[in-house]
Amino acid sequence: MAGTVNFAQVSMVLKHQPLGIWLSLALIIFIVGFGVKSAIVPMHTWLPDAHPEAPSPISAMLSGILIETALYGLTRVLYILFEPSTFQMAIAVLAVLTMCLANILALLQQDIKRLLAYSSIAQMGYMLIGVAAGTSYGIMGVFLHVFNHSLLKGMAFLAAGSIVHEAKTRDIENLKGIGRLMPVTSILSLIHI
């Protein structure tokens, strides 16, 4: 289509093209590809299963770095290669679905790490709303939220790992009274929330 792989040159060519079948297909492939990595609903199913299986430091990096990196990639590709009007509605719909479904599923969890995983997915929905807004303030809000989420969700997974190590369970029902046993860790968990 553009005869080059240089993003700046591809952008100059594609932004003046009508959205035909090939550009639509490319847009869908980018959204699905980055959507899987950033755990956007309905491509989120791997993340709640990955967090309970991973050690807590890996969960902290997975939630604090990996999914945000994919969101950054999605944002860059969308805004460099496409006109915002071509993707804003689709991204907004995915954002609302991601926020709503992930929050509902988070409330139904008994495993502390699955709860945090669904919380991370919901946060991706909040960030996607900024991407869909298509304004400079929306994008600034996205990256501020990315920074905050990276720090705080990483801290939450590390705190959850300490709690699980001490309590020998991830079941939230069995963690009653853990605040008296681990006050500093519990306070750090409250800061995240």
Predicted stretch roles:
Residues 1-191:
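Hydrophobic transmembrane alpha-helices and their helix-loop junctions in integral membrane proteins
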